């Protein structure tokens, strides 16, 4: 198998952000196909709450990073779908992160749930167009639920800033880190 020269670098790393404590196991219990789109919409609905606690360009984050990266994800999935239709095998490496507010065990669990919500979104994207490729191993996803981010974030005195502060916001994410295509 030869590695093809498809270039996805314009998309990478693709960071997709999550509100505090989302998704939860209950989200998946109530909605087994709970996916990132739902998390994205729910997060956007909390913009006013984040604005109360965080004046540091929060609107820029919500527009550029949250909305912008969701749109970028959809463009990437369209391209991947086309490449898969052309006979490529594609491997995605996805890493989940959490802020430092909770303990390590919880952070690994929520990171894993975040990855699961993204995989569910990929599965449901464009009426399930990518499903067959996941089933026949033409689209492979390597999951790395890291837990707590490797950033230099310090625990602050204010628990509200541990939820609404810039460091916490930027650490609650799933990143598509690597994409390899083979033909």
Label each PLM-derived region with a short phrase.
Residues 4, 18, 24-95, 123, ...:
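Periplasmic peptidoglycan-binding/anchoring modules of Gram-negative envelope and division proteins
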Residues 9-10:
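An acidic-aromatic substrate-binding cleft motif
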Residues 13-16, 20, 25, 83, ...:
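Periplasmic OmpA/Pal-like peptidoglycan-binding modules at the C-termini of bacterial envelope proteins
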Residues 29-32, 106-107, 156-157:
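Short coil/turn segments at secondary-structure boundaries
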Residues 94-97, 111, 144:
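Solvent-exposed beta-strand motifs enriched in subsets of small alpha/beta binding domains
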Residues 106-119, 160:
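Short, low-complexity, polybasic intrinsically disordered segments
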